[in-house]
Amino acid sequence: MLARVTRKMLRHAKCFQRLAIFGSVRALHKDNRTATPQNFSNYESMKQDFKLGIPEYFNFAKDVLDQWTDKEKAGKKPSNPAFWWINRNGEEMRWSFEELGSLSRKFANILSEACSLQRGDRVILILPRVPEWWLANVACLRTGTVLIPGTTQLTQKDILYRLQSSKANCIITNDVLAPAVDAVASKCENLHSKLIVSENSREGWGNLKELMKHASDSHTCVKTKHNEIMAIFFTSGTSGYPKMTAHTHSSFGLGLSVNGRFWLDLTPSDVMWNTSDTGWAKSAWSSVFSPWIQGACVFTHHLPRFEPTSILQTLSKYPITVFCSAPTVYRMLVQNDITSYKFKSLKHCVSAGEPITPDVTEKWRNKTGLDIYEGYGQTETVLICGNFKGMKIKPGSMGKPSPAFDVKIVDVNGNVLPPGQEGDIGIQVLPNRPFGLFTHYVDNPSKTASTLRGNFYITGDRGYMDKDGYFWFVARADDVILSSGYRIGPFEVENALNEHPSVAESAVVSSPDPIRGEVVKAFVVLNPDYKSHDQEQLIKEIQEHVKKTTAPYKYPRKVEFIQELPKTISGKTKRNELRKKEWKTI
């Protein structure tokens, strides 16, 4: 079904200086050019010139992917593949845009015929980084079915919650998770179709590999309005049960062009590798829409578990030009001897998900000669702020607002605050709601309404803007610590902690105190070399280090060493769980 092609290194194609923007997408780029560093040498002028027109009808598969197929056939695109997959066994697979189109149309016919799905039906997709995950994404676009990704780390309880809350009609997964689905399927009244990606058959499941052998690649893409729901993403659940975030064909299908063009700086000649788990919106950001709207190659490595040396070897062996990974990954990579690897093709590195500490970016730059361009966004949005090529990077800053959004710091009444004052990070949505923003939380109107304050969508994050227009993250609104009249964000304290050689990871929360009301408490995971040290002495050393690194009133008056931090399935620290533990006796 999925033909394996022989291994050989990609020939570097000369970068196109111009990118034709097809049909309904043309309004995205006023000058029809891909991003270049000089775009942001004059940030204000660039942002002012940015224009967007949203067409009434838009479907990413038809209006972008199929158009790249036409460019490819006409020889008007570099010879990069659309998709390049490898695994640890040395197997490789590459598809052109034409092959991607043919295979995804077969998959679309399976959804419509074998699964009896109709436009608007909901499809939960739980697969690791296998080629079928990308085909399923495009097949859902072609059929107008609503994609709902999930991570392979979900438990049986998690799967039940997602099936029931989303009212999913179909689930696509592998033989590892199929037993968990079968165990809860009888409790999910809307579920009527199950597809398995496996070499083996399973009772009650359609086998995708077998169905693909007989499916037709003749399929007419549905005509979707730009504001139809395209996908539902579950949030990571850092402050409670995961919410269902609805995105339209335009909010991600068009909105993520801002990411691809400006933040990722992609052209049709680029090979982009994003290491995000397939269950999260970040994979939609950087493994589907952002690279493909620019005609770039999506590269992926099916690593069953995180292996720093495998990542470094892959960056060295393959012609990857743009690399995107989480701050935790970069932190682990810089602990290795990077200088023994040569990244001959790599030219641009980005990170998102959580703030990246300045010490990590400095180590990466010293070892590779490359900056890490941090970006800030949410499941609910495309890129909100970013450090863009051609712009001065301020280490630790989220950068400046993306061209898509008017971002401000606002107070509790929705008034805009001046530079230097901490407040809530908001995106202006009135009088004109920007593209690239979710529509609502599914079946949760009260939560949707709570995100609006005056003319702004409130992100739930605290921050401030400096005099140069750069935004700085302080904390999730509910993570801020109030001690003796001071407002303390955990991120700056964690930054200071993580710079101490004994600290592998840390999380900072509030802890009750009879005099100050609450104080800063640090939960610290020690590096192996320090686990045998005298803990009382080590606590004093760490506290003194923080006092010297940041404002003394922010130092953790309480320190507890733990084996590991509690984290969400997406790898984000669950500070709320640590905070509840501290306050449970009050």
From Swiss-Prot:
| Enzyme Commission identifier(s) | 6.2.1.2, 6.2.1.17
Q: Does the keyword Lipid metabolism apply?
A: yes
One MF term in the entry's GO annotations: metal ion binding
Localisation per UniProt entry:
Mitochondrion; Mitochondrion matrix
Q: Does the UniProt entry include the keyword Transcription? A: no
Q: List residues binding ATP.
A: 235-243, 374-379, 461, 476, 572
Q: Positions modified as N6-acetyllysine?
A: K157
**Which Gene3D superfamilies would you find in this protein's record?**
3.30.300.30, N-terminal domain of ligase-like
Which CDD domains does the entry link to? MACS_euk (cd05928)
Enumerate the cofactors the protein uses.
Mg(2+); Mn(2+)
Segment annotated as transit peptide: 1-27
Record-linked InterPro entries: AMP-bd_C, AMP-bd_C_sf, AMP-binding_CS, AMP-dep_synth/lig_dom, ANL_N_sf, Mitochondrial_ACSM
N6-succinyllysine is found on K73, K106
Q: Which UniProt keywords apply?
A: Acetylation, ATP-binding, Fatty acid metabolism, Ligase, Lipid metabolism, Magnesium, Metal-binding, Mitochondrion, Nucleotide-binding, Transit peptide
Q: Indicate the family of this protein.
A: Belongs to the ATP-dependent AMP-binding enzyme family.
Function of the protein:
Catalyzes the activation of fatty acids by CoA to produce an acyl-CoA, the first step in fatty acid metabolism. Capable of activating medium-chain fatty acids with a preference for isobutyrate among fatty acids with 2-6 carbon atoms.
| Name of the protein | Acyl-coenzyme A synthetase ACSM3, mitochondrial
Gene assigned in the entry? ACSM3
